[in-house]
């Protein structure tokens, strides 16, 4: 090989040294030790879903194939896709005049796809900035379009992201293409508890619902478009759900490339290109799990209890733990808190890991702690976290 490389004038490149494996955590866990994953995403999945996927990994339903290796155009996968959509429709009570797509590119791709598809013939899009992800969306939306991305409200300027811009304060033009907002902000722990009501003469709502979809009841008919990355409350990363009102498809211009064009994806039954087959399959298993739990209605009850219990532990800590968010705007999905001391916060993150409470560090720009308590997080996980919080306070308070 060296002679061949020398003849071609190419040089050999030494491989970097292989580093010895170091376990991330310094405690050995047994199968009986409960592990609770508080990651903001990719996030916890129901154990029964993982075990079903495990049992079907090599042979899905007697086909002799794994879903990972199955043709996306096979009858078997088309059935998986069909049932995933139907189960999602049932869970969210999606009206017949809405289309459902399983796309790729994450929710971030929708920042531009919504503008490219829905602003044809319009001069303005209204954008509400309420936290980190809506801020990024606002920055991204205008990059591939000449339409004016108008800042309708800014929660950072109004409240330093400790409260949400009231809907009454949104500066909305009735002639705008749509109003974009993020209903739950994972970084700042903010959530609109009530869906904004804009009126029939106002632009349609386009909502990033990534971190709360299926966690509570919503009226899909209140929205023009709902989109959600799967990796928080649905399934593994790799697929993005888009729910779009049918009449809005008339805005999709043929000048938008097919891969970014909602109408092109719908006209091809979601098969314009190869969809994320395995994430769709896992998402379908999660939808069935949600149905077995009593649907979104039951999950809303459990999620409300989990959040209420955890916030009570923070508020009743005598100031040792702090949450700066206005109570009415507190997220039920992403609970942020801190001790007010960076060294103590880091110690909390380290020690909680040894107790099986994983990935509690706050977002990199925020610090502190963040407990993401999505649908698949059991109440027992929240109770285990609270128990550790009290023990930690006794030692260092």
Residue ranges and their predicted role:
Residues 5, 28, 35, 354, ...:
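PLP-dependent enzyme catalytic core of the Aspartate aminotransferase-like
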Residues 34-85:
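A glycine-/small-polar-enriched, mobile loop at the entrance of the PLP active site in fold-type I
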Residues 41, 141, 154-213:
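Active-site phosphate-binding strand-loop segment of PLP-dependent enzymes
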Residues 64-110, 117, 132, 139-140:
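Conserved N-terminal alpha-helix of the aminotransferase class I/II PLP-enzyme fold
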Residues 108-179:
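PLP-dependent aminotransferase-like
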Residues 206, 220-231:
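Conserved active-site segment immediately N-terminal to the catalytic lysine
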Residues 230-311, 326, 395-397:
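Active-site C-terminal subdomain of aminotransferase-like
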Residues 321-352:
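Conserved PLP-binding catalytic core of the aspartate aminotransferase-like
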């Amino acid at each position: 090989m060296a002679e061949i490389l020398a003849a071609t004038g190419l040089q050999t490149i030494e491989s970097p040294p292989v580093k010895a494996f170091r376990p991330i955590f310094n405690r050995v866990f047994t199968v009986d030790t409960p592990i609770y994953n508080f990651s903001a995403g990719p996030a916890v999945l129901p154990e029964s879903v993982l075990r079903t996927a495990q049992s079907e990994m090599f042979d899905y339903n007697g086909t002799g194939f794994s879903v990972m290796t199955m043709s996306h155009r096979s009858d078997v996968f088309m059935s998986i896709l069909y049932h995933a959509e139907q189960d999602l429709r049932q869970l969210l009570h999606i009206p017949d005049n809405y289309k459902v797509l399983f796309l790729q590119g994450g929710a971030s791709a929708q920042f531009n796809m919504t503008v490219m598809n829905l602003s044809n013939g319009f001069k303005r899009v209204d954008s509400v900035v309420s936290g980190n992800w809506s801020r990024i969306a606002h920055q991204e939306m205008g990059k591939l379009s000449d339409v004016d991305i108008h800042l309708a409200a800014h929660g950072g300027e109004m409240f330093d992201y400790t409260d949400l811009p009231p809907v009454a304060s949104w500066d909305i033009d009735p002639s705008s293409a749509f109003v974009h907002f993020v209903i739950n902000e994972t970084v700042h722990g903010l959530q609109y508890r009530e869906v904004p009501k804009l009126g029939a003469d106002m632009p349609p709502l386009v909502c990033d619902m990534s971190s709360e979809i299926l966690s509570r009841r919503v009226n899909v008919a209140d929205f023009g478009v709902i989109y959600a990355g799967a990796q928080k409350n649905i399934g593994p990363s790799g697929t993005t759900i888009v729910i779009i009102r049918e009449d809005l498809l008339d805005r999709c211009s043929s000048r938008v490339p097919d891969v970014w064009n909602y109408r092109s994806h719908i006209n091809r039954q979601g098969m314009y290109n190869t969809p994320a087959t395995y994430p769709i399959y896992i998402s379908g298993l999660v939808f069935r799990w949600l149905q077995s739990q009593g649907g979104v209605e039951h999950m809303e009850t459990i999620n409300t209890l989990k959040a209420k219990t955890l916030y009570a532990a923070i508020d009743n800590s005598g100031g040792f733990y702090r949450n700066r968010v206005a109570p009415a705007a507190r997220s039920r999905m992403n609970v942020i808190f801190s001790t007010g001391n960076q060294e103590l916060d880091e110690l909390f993150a380290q020690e909680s890991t040894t107790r099986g409470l994983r990935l509690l560090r706050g977002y990199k720009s925020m610090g502190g702690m963040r407990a993401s308590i999505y649908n698949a997080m059991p109440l027992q996980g929240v109770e285990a976290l609270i128990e550790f919080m009290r023990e930690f306070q006794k030692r260092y308070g």
